[in-house]
Amino acid sequence: MKVSLKNIVVFIATAVVMLLVISMSLAASPASAIEVKGSTSSTQEQAGAQVDSKPQAVLNDYENAVAALINNYRTSSGLNAIAYEPTLTYIAKLRSADLMDRGYFSHYTPEGTTVFDLMKANGITSKIRGENLGQAMPAGIGSPEAFLGAWRNSPSHNANMLRVGYNYIGVGMVDNGDRIVVTTVFTN
């Protein structure tokens, strides 16, 4: 096996970044932390996900990395990979933007609505659905890997990512330089 200097440098840089993320998250104060909000999921007796001509969004590189990490985790756990869904991504981006713009961090908006209300308003009905939220302050500690790690370490978020029956995912990330908010939404 031929090892190049570039590969060694990339490996060392990656290790240093991961150690920094881990040490910062372990020693983080409330002003410097990756926080996840208790996952929500719901099961309803309705038709499967129905998506026609609804608002759609495309994953950016960061969001794509989050989705890929979740899929790798699911498949390494013996579950099916889940497909990117443009309307769910639109909804996830709306959620992250609302959390950022209005400065709250909850599965409930200040008006008491949830992502499930947003799904219904955008024509998505499903039997199985869920949401994971995460935020990082300062924004620099909020890598896709850090969010996956935080969700894996939270029993409710981990169960939500590994829920049998999910077929679709949407991911939305907003970064204002000081704070990153990531929303993942899942449906069958």
Residue ranges: model-predicted function:
Residues 3-6, 32, 115-187:
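A well-ordered secondary-structure block
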Residues 51-55, 80, 139:
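Short amphipathic alpha-helical segments at helix-loop
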Residues 22-44:
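Sec-dependent signal peptide cleavage junction
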Residues 4-29:
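Sec-dependent N-terminal signal peptides of Gram-positive bacterial secreted proteins and lipoproteins
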Residues 7, 75, 96, 158-159:
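Hydrophobic alpha-helical segments, especially transmembrane helices
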Residues 58-122, 164, 168-170:
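Short, well-ordered surface patches within globular domains
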Residues 47-51, 73-75, 93-96, 125-127, ...:
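A short alpha-helix capping/helix-coil boundary motif
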Residues 38-65, 71:
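N-terminal low-complexity, Pro/Thr/Ser-rich intrinsically disordered segments
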